[in-house]
């Protein structure tokens, strides 16, 4: 995901990017949860699984690598893509905790990320339509000419 997601978000049309951001990136977490509950059942004591030795370090690496890489991006779509990598790290961290609050937080974050990242890319699609590019430098002062769109971008960004 660290490799293909930024390129997929960057080069895909805005409508496709909205779909990718809202649905396809969460499939890995859904499949993992579905597999666990189908194979083991909901009454299984998940503490016996050793997720904390494998999944927990990988989730933490995804969180930090995605966030640090996002800081240095100048293309807004790539920035959002690396942010999604970090967000998926948060979701995997909830699964790796192997307890009810962790799973509840993961499921809540899946829905929140799907709605808000989709909304972010819809607003970004409006910006791309208006400006023709997605660089951070070109967005300077855009809140004066597109206040509602930039308000949606800020609200969506703060909700994640």
Report each predicted region and the residues it spans:
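Hydrophobic transmembrane alpha-helices and their helix-loop junctions in integral membrane proteins
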Residues: 1-160
């Amino acid at each position: 995901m660290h490799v293909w997601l930024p390129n997929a978000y960057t080069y895909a049309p805005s409508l496709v990017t909205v779909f990718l951001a809202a649905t396809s990136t969460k499939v890995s977490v859904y499949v993992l949860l579905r597999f666990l509950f189908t194979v083991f059942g909901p009454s299984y004591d998940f503490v016996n699984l050793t997720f904390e030795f494998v999944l927990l370090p990988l989730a933490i690496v995804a969180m930090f690598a995605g966030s640090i890489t996002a800081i240095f991006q100048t293309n807004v779509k790539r920035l959002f893509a690396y942010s999604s990598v970090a967000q998926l790290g948060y979701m995997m961290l909830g699964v790796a905790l192997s307890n009810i609050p962790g799973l509840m937080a993961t499921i809540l974050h899946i829905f929140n990320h799907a709605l808000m990242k989709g909304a972010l890319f819809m607003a970004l699609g409006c910006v791309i339509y208006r400006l023709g590019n997605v660089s951070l430098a070109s967005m300077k002062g855009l809140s004066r000419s597109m206040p509602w769109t930039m308000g949606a971008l800020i609200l969506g960004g703060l909700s994640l």
